[in-house]
């Protein structure tokens, strides 16, 4: 009887994560991650430029489009990069077989990254691999044409990835200073990808008190659109709160907000000195910034190398609704603000025309007012107190149809002068006062002048008693029409006719 002794076959069950660098920017990001010593992932580099591909620090390289580009690059034409990736589609699939998660990193706006990244994402999606895209947008000084190519490439890539993270290169100016070198600035952008990948690998490598597995990552990141990944560290007092705030506030990411996140994965990592209150403080600091209905998955792990340091990693996804809500109201507010401006400028145009005749009437009224106030100042308060109560109701109905322009002109002075009384009542009460006083005042000198003119000489007495020059002008105007049919010459003619005619006839 033969006895065979053999070691039991054990299969290592752990997720396989691949970082796929596409184009020149993607290859540089992979090289920086390899130099940083990131472990637990596989690195693959694909490029149409054979010369640039030789500088890759990984042995897994793919020459895209050998027949199409012949290793000379895509020439900043995305359609060339797309055709090159389609030519190398089988080789791309070989590197993706067996992977559970793939990070596709590229720089948008060029030829290879813009055109080939969507094809690689499509290949990964066909195999059911959790696909995350981490791409950069060009600087503003690179021109609008390159920015339009980047936007179209991002839209095409978003069709095939589960989660997309966009890093505008222009945001590097938020963290860079005068001494920041060009290489260091791009290293900051690559750090976003590095921290995001490390936050995923730490979940599966480090022992967790509150364990998180790859299934939780898939739940948070599958079919979630725009995402935000950040990692923050803190030391000293309030280190947990500082780490949480640094993880959320990443100035390099595109304009996204945690308010609209549908799913959030939070992992707090620290040394053996990490306390329960610190874990609670870090978790609450992030949950307060998220919608209460969001799916929050929390985990905590220990890392002996982080003695005195707390690290918080956040993966928030599903923020397309928040970004759209921030963009849509802007053009609406401009249209709303522009509409009243057009209406306001068109309305006051006819107003200055009626304002001119009113100025003429107002200029004529002050000439009549001194006549009213000079002889009789006392009867005015009696008219103000008694007249406006019964008269305004009747005058409102008569003045509105006949005079349409008076309420507009009288409304302006009523606001500044009359503060206690209703301006509508004041306008009605003020209008009949002046014509009534002028009416009676014009009648009185006419009666006196007509009465004294019958006897003669009374006109001179009235003119001597009047002291105001304006009253003399008023009496002169009323007396002049009566001086034209002068009766005195008629009496003289009568005397001339009576004396010679009667005397001669009687004498004869």
Curated annotation (Swiss-Prot):
Residues 342-389, 428-508 are annotated as: Disordered. The keyword Cell division applies. Keywords: Cell cycle, Cell division, Cytoplasm, GTP-binding, Nucleotide-binding, Septation. Its main location: cytoplasm. Disulfide bonds: none annotated. GO terms for biological process: division septum assembly; FtsZ-dependent cytokinesis; protein polymerization. Signal peptide: none annotated. Residues 464-482 have a biased composition (Low complexity). PROSITE patterns: FTSZ_1, FTSZ_2. It is found in: Cytoplasm. It comes from the Bacteria. One of its GO terms (cellular component) is cell division site. GO terms for molecular function: GTP binding; GTPase activity. GTP binds at residues 24-28, 111-113, 142, 146, 190. Homodimer. Polymerizes to form a dynamic ring structure in a strictly GTP-dependent manner. Interacts directly with several other division proteins. Essential cell division protein that forms a contractile ring structure (Z ring) at the future cell division site. The regulation of the ring assembly controls the timing and the location of cell division. One of the functions of the FtsZ ring is to recruit other cell division proteins to the septum to produce a new cell wall between the dividing cells. Binds GTP and shows GTPase activity. Belongs to the FtsZ family. NCBIfam families: ftsZ (TIGR00065). This is Cell division protein FtsZ. It comes from Caulobacter vibrioides (strain NA1000 / CB15N) (Caulobacter crescentus). The gene is ftsZ.
